[in-house]
Amino acid sequence: FGEEIEALEFFVCVDIFPTIATAYADVIFPDCCWGEVDGTFTNTERRVQRIRKVLDPPGEVRPHWWVLQELAKRINGYDLGFTSEESVWEDMRKTATSCAGITYERIEEVGLQWPCPTLDHPGTPLMHTSGNFTRGKGLFHHTDHIPPAELPDEAYPFLLSTGRRLWHYHTATQTRNSVGLENLFPEELMEISPVDAE
């Protein structure tokens, strides 16, 4: 990761906490966290829902749309036309026809599932109900096996396999900064069989 980033002429990062990526950044823009923004959220069942800001971000933190808008203006004088999260969504509706019928008004109370191509479309809770698929049935591709860069040997006879923890999302890059979660699970643990531990 670091080598690729260091090879860049200029690297801008937007994040809510210091991370591995921000350590390489030439410029870091502080980001709003989930409770500090308005907008939409699309989950894995294709449901587009509204999210609402519950508190203002600290200091001079600005939402993503504002950062992009200002960067475009200052780098090449281009106005993206964004004035709010809703204006970004309206721009997306013009580009992504599968979401053209989803407006903030329509998802104020309950989300809609795309595709929803028109304003009178009810959304699509179930896709492919006829059994016919746009591209046919699942497309599988053969890939060649790439062996691991390192294998266990006499000096290092074990493999480390990481897993998930209830208290921390992903690799804890963001959740580790939550005092409450950190108090629940302050350090990692390793499980190993008694025989291997000897």
Task: List PLM regions with ranges.
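A cross-kingdom feature strongest in bacterial/archaeal respiratory oxidoreductases
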Residues: 1-59, 90-198
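Non-catalytic, well-ordered alpha-helical segments in soluble enzyme domains
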Residues: 65-81
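Short catalytic/ligand-gating loop segments at beta-alpha or beta-beta junctions
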Residues: 83-88
